[in-house]
Amino acid sequence: MSKYQAIISFEMDEEFMTLVPPHRTYINYLLNKGILDSYAVSMESQTTWMTINANSKIEVFDLLDKSPLSKYWTYEVFELFVYDSQSTRLPTVQLN
């Protein structure tokens, strides 16, 4: 299994906002299943970043296309060579 970074641009309208709750349900499902490692949205730039665990780019495209918001998106997907974050590291040892 590989990690992929999806960079998604979107434009909003009234219908977009009505689809946010079912989209969040889908995102929570992906997070709970360990398919999605991280999810971030900037309303300022109307961009979303997702780090996704999948076997191929095609699988990532299929996952993205299942979102209720997918018709508002244009996106690029890149396979990651390195993925490091605070949450993937062991906790710091604290001596008493």
Regions found by a protein language model. Name each.
Residues M1-N96:
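Conserved, structured core segments of small domains
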